[in-house]
Amino acid sequence: MALATVMAANAQKFVFKGSVKTADGKAIQGVVVNNGTDFTTTDAKGQWTLCTDTCVSKFVQISTPADYVLPKSKSIAKGFYVSVGQLVKDKCRHNFVLQPRDTKDNTFYYIAISDPQVKNDKHMELWRSQTVEDLKATTDALSKEHEVVTMTLGDIVWDNMQLFDDYAESIQQLPITAFQCIGNHDFDRRYQALNNMPYGSGVYGEQAYCTHFGPTDYSFNIAGVHVVTLKNINYMGKKGYREQFTEAQLAWLRRDLSYVPKGSMVIINMHAALWNPVEKEGNVLNANDLKSVLRGYRVHIFNGHTHFFHNNTVGNDIYEHNIGAACGAWWRGDVNRCGAPNGYLVVKASADSLTSQYKPTGGDYAQQMRVYSKGEFLSQPYSVVANVWDCDSLTTVEWYEDGQYRGKMTQFTDSDERYLQSRGSHVKECVTTHLFKATPAWGSHKVKVVVKNRFGQVHTETVDVNRAWLKALSSDKRPKVIAHRGYWRYEGAVQNSLSSLRASAQAGVYGSEFDVQITADGEVIVNHDPHLGGLPIAKSTYAQLVKARLGNGEPIPTLAKYLDEAKKHKDLKIILEIKKQANDSVEAVLVRKTLEAVKASGLSSRVQYISFSQFVCDQIIRNDKTADVAYLGGNMSPKEVKEHGFSGIDYSMDVLRVHPEWIDKAHKLGLTVNVWTIATEEHLKFVTTLHPDFITTDIPEDALRMLSKGNNK
């Protein structure tokens, strides 16, 4: 049995031979040839020989020398490799044919494209109509100056191997030589990678990819630059994988680089990031092993996988470009998870230098940042914010206020506002470090942001400080104003008092909000906190609490007295918050007594109920099918709120910053949207840009003044 196994294994080993010549038969000496494990070079006759185990090696390939044209077919890089299956069919011989370059060009353009990730025909159409159309214009222009090489950095498809043909067909008319790198979604999920399958297996995870595009690890030379592509996805099958190089791959790279002089410019392509500090869990596990192999070379590494942009300088000689994806956040919008637009990186390279510039799909090279005016970036409502995606430690981001130089903007980490607004609710948040902020003075008009990158390229953008606010004011969707606990900042008034209710009516707001609690003996009183005069309301009788006074000397109003006062102000809506209680039983009693009081007052048509308690909201609907009820909790989507039969969402600014899409979804479901609590004019300006139906604010008169265009009723 053991002997048979050895014989079977040996039967897979072949001595492959061949040559590397020009079309007219001229031998090319010194060409590096390898089978993924062993290396050789062609002799003076252009001949090569490699003993190859076809259970381990699936290709024999050359590293095309810089003096020869990169072989291709219909724009896809071909001709630099031959499958071992074809070699066996051809009696173990293969002759590579190369074309000498007519002229020597010391510069070339290199376009790095990350994650097309097409899953279906819809995605393929987006790839064709957006990315490929943009690439056509770009490569048509660049190819008039220098040769253009493209590299797709993995996740060409999204677990749909049948789309490899469509991808190849989509770029066949471009004036490029297109190379590919394998990503985790380019494996057939039924199988593990070849290195993890049983020895001699006839199937493996990267088989379909290899059939279309050749070996996963390969190299070539152009304009004095050595270019290497490596698989760094160790695929386990069923979508499982580790970002990792195998020891065999690192050994292959050492052999490959042994033919390249130290100090040379080297480009390395791979799918997963190596040293991305934002999401370290997705980095290659043995990245530092690669680092040691690259010692002594000037290296630029290009990768994707993260769907966001981040540059890293690693020591003095390694620069990692973890670029934004062509599909952005999986074709759900026009931005990546970091806010960088969908696009690709255009690199100008030679043996001595390498410069790069991101090209947004559908945009131009001048679009190297997105600048948010005051009120457009929710977590920074007072600031102008610049998202400068292709930046690094040598990038400077400075600002001018109405023509006056103000210095460097402050870098900070947060989620990009554009991404938060465009992402689906099932796509997780992502933070980025390439955000910069500056706070202009009150009354300023224009802010100019000036970005200078490591290559000396300068980009500027100027914004109107009040852009978002002015746009919102020009809309018919200005929110109605609700006074938070009444207009308590009015002279002589305090929160949740009859005086603050009267002041709300006098100010002309849409509604006045207040809170109710229930005493131990069942009296419903108006108060926000669960304690009054040092006593717990729920455990105290009304008689024990009645002597307490508000800050202006008014007695604590009962709900009945509050509603009696509300009757006098017929144009004022009453926004009644039923506070959460110790348990469902107490809440049920509070709901029943509140509804009875409202019905007795004759104000049912003017009262809108709100509560943080889902149980309270459900009880209101159960007892009064016509009640107008909005949920305050912030933990339910508009769809869930609608399913409960509530009429609106009443959420804080913080909640709606995380889920800005809920506003539009709520409106489409016929729900109203209120945002609370607006305490400053800057917050008011920002929230207005979200187009809610209502705002609850501590500055109702200021809000009315600022929203004075049109009728607020």
Task: List each model region and its residues.
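N-terminal active-site segment of His-dependent metallophosphoesterases
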Residues: 13-16, 24, 73-164
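Short, ordered, surface-exposed loop/turn motifs in non-cytosolic proteins
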Residues: 14-37, 54-55
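Hydrophobic beta-strand segments
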Residues: 31-35, 60, 397-399
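A short, solvent-exposed loop/turn motif at the edges and junctions
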Residues: 35, 55-83
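Short, acidic Ser/Thr/Gly-rich low-complexity loop/linker segments typical of extracellular
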Residues: 37-53, 410-411
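Extended active-site neighborhood of metal-dependent phosphoesterases/phosphodiesterases
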Residues: 66-67, 72-73, 85, 161-262, ...
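Binuclear metal-dependent phosphoesterase catalytic core
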Residues: 318-391, 395-401, 433-461
